[in-house]
Amino acid sequence: MVGTPLFSNAKKILLLGSGELGKEVIIEAQRFGVECIAVDSYENAPAMQVAHKYHIIDMKDAGALRAVIEKEKPDLIVPEIEAINTDTLKEMESEGYHVVPTANATKLTMDREGIRRLAFEKLGLRTAKYEFAENLEELKEAVTRIGIPCIIKPIMSSSGKGQSTIKSESDIKTAWNYAKSAARGIGTKVIVEEFIKFDYEITLLTARTAEGTRFCEPIGHIQVDGDYHESWQPHPMCAPTKAKAQEMAKKITDELGGYGIFGVELFVLDDEVIFSEVSPRPHDTGMVTMVTQKMSEFEIHARAILGLPVNVDIVSPGASHVIKSEILKWAPEYEIHEASKVKDTKIRLFGKPIAKVGRRMGVALAVSDDVIKAREHAEKVAHLVKIK
């Protein structure tokens, strides 16, 4: 049951992190009459622009986080980013607050060490070989054991920040410094991963609901510098490999528990499926579902956490392509007239208050009778949008 927003009987969601994904979650939750409060570390974040109210705090600060939760007394606490004090979330959950999907799942998936150890050491899922390092000397030793080439990532970061590929020993120090500069949270620990020459990588959106687990069609995607660049749905997979992917996704999401959508990232090499990462919330590559599915990943997430039924049916092949800034500017302007002329496409601008070089400012979406055409159209639209 839901009440009326801004009245005493309102059902309240407190969103921790107010980026473009959270913005869409709030829009979907508001369609069901849910009162939405957005929280982030800076003013005018995308989700704040559509929320009933917002707060600006450092979410890594235990006292500040506890204070805003106790002030708002939400029915659901919905994390959207990694930079959150997860120990405080566990405390609040023990005091009766509901963290989506669970506080433990949030804590485990916020750092690559926790989720990698869970996937490989506890559940026995196939992963890339990995080591952890807390200083430069340990990193050099780990690289020697893993072998070159290999991947270096902070154990806590987002959107590919801090990620490097080691191609020779001379790259190690630069990679270490870059990882430290981009790390979110406390400490400087990094993960060293085996470089896998996979055939392709997918996101398998996995919805845990009161009615059971549902899988969206696989989403293919390409990353540039470790960050999502374009995605498409469906990505073709043979039935046995798809079944392996679903089995792996169910195993990891069942262990994490709770309700909501999970973005499970997987590599595929020949007919083998290799676990990469999992996010207990909507995934950036899943923005394509805004045009490909009956219900977008955002609607599915909102419905699942509210205990409502979901539909994962696909209605059309489609694609997404990021719109990135090439300039640094406060309150940028967008030329979208030419881009809006392209048939069967949509533009979603996120409303970020400042444009930075390489920052994701929007996404172009396209549908077609096949994903190849959709990818071409989405890329065309993305490049037609001019940020000034």
Swiss-Prot record:
UniProt keyword annotations, A-Z: ATP-binding, Ligase, Magnesium, Metal-binding, Nucleotide-binding, Purine biosynthesis
Enzyme class: ligase
Ligand binding (ATP): R112, K153, S158, S159, G160, K161, G162, Q163, E193, E194, F195, I196, E201
Claim: Amino-acid biosynthesis is one of the keywords in the record: no
Top-rank taxon, per record: Archaea
Enzyme Commission number(s) of this protein: 6.3.1.21
UniProt: Mg(2+) binding residues: E265, E277
Gene Ontology cellular component list: cytosol
Domain ATP-grasp as annotated: residue spans: 117-306
Regions crossing the membrane: none
Pathway membership, UniProt: Purine metabolism; IMP biosynthesis via de novo pathway; N(2)-formyl-N(1)-(5-phospho-D-ribosyl)glycinamide from N(1)-(5-phospho-D-ribosyl)glycinamide (formate route): step 1/1
Molecular function in Gene Ontology: ATP binding; magnesium ion binding; phosphoribosylglycinamide formyltransferase 2 activity; phosphoribosylglycinamide formyltransferase activity
Reactions catalysed: N(1)-(5-phospho-beta-D-ribosyl)glycinamide + formate + ATP = N(2)-formyl-N(1)-(5-phospho-beta-D-ribosyl)glycinamide + ADP + phosphate + H(+)
Biological-process GO terms, alphabetical: 'de novo' IMP biosynthetic process
Stated family: Belongs to the PurK/PurT family.
NCBIfam families per the UniProt record, alphabetical: PRK09288.1, purT
Cited HAMAP family: PurT
The protein's assembly and partners: Homodimer.
Chain's role: Involved in the de novo purine biosynthesis. Catalyzes the transfer of formate to 5-phospho-ribosyl-glycinamide (GAR), producing 5-phospho-ribosyl-N-formylglycinamide (FGAR). Formate is provided by PurU via hydrolysis of 10-formyl-tetrahydrofolate.
PANTHER family referenced in this protein's UniProt entry, alphabetically: FORMATE-DEPENDENT PHOSPHORIBOSYLGLYCINAMIDE FORMYLTRANSFERASE
Name of this protein: Formate-dependent phosphoribosylglycinamide formyltransferase
Organism: Methanococcus maripaludis (strain DSM 14266 / JCM 13030 / NBRC 101832 / S2 / LL)
